[in-house]
């Protein structure tokens, strides 16, 4: 039987699920928002980052993971949220919220500044264990997503695709988008070979993603 490329991550076992629950049940506090490499906090713990197109549901996912309704705040103004936001998850982890990309309305200087910061962060952050790239299940991988995936390849940063808003499409539509995403990921050597299907609204996949973050060492 031929194995499916980029299968969905399996449901965690009880012990792994508990490790994820305990990690995210602890304190999670906003540390700082940075716009320059010099302002990054000390690289003294493991960190994971979340990247995605604007309106992909990144803030909702971070809030669902941490069980806090307003920890990460979305901006409805194009180009406004151009900081790397750091959250301390207990004493051992940073959750890093990267600025949403893909705003056509954002002024060019802001976009260029963000691109420089992102490239510097991905290339120079030795404690970064994984990037979670969020893809809207309604739309699949877009050309603007390809840009960030290629940048992650070049930076040799392992990334894992997290499908968002899975409750907004039918099962048939979901399978079609998964096929498209799997085809796109075959071209990217830095892609972790499992996908996570989520819905922040319904809680789908949240335990699985918590477990993944907890097991990264």
From Swiss-Prot:
Annotated ranges, domain EngB-type G: 44-217
Gene3D superfamilies with a match to the protein in the record: P-loop containing nucleotide triphosphate hydrolases
UniProt xrefs under Pfam families: MMR_HSR1 (PF01926)
UniProt KW Cell membrane keyword: no
Family designation: Belongs to the TRAFAC class TrmE-Era-EngA-EngB-Septin-like GTPase superfamily. EngB GTPase family.
Sequence positions that bind Mg(2+): 59, 81
Residue ranges crossing the lipid bilayer per the database entry: none
GO BP of this protein: division septum assembly
Reported function: Necessary for normal cell division and for the maintenance of normal septation.
Protein name (database record): Probable GTP-binding protein EngB
Gene Ontology CC, one term: cytosol
Residues holding GTP: 52-59, 79-83, 97-100, 164-167, 198-200
Record InterPro entries: G_ENGB_dom, GTP-bd, GTP-bd_ribosome_bio_YsxC, P-loop_NTPase
Cofactor(s) recorded in Swiss-Prot or TrEMBL: Mg(2+)
UniProtKB keywords: Cell cycle, Cell division, GTP-binding, Magnesium, Metal-binding, Nucleotide-binding, Septation
A molecular function (GO) term: metal ion binding
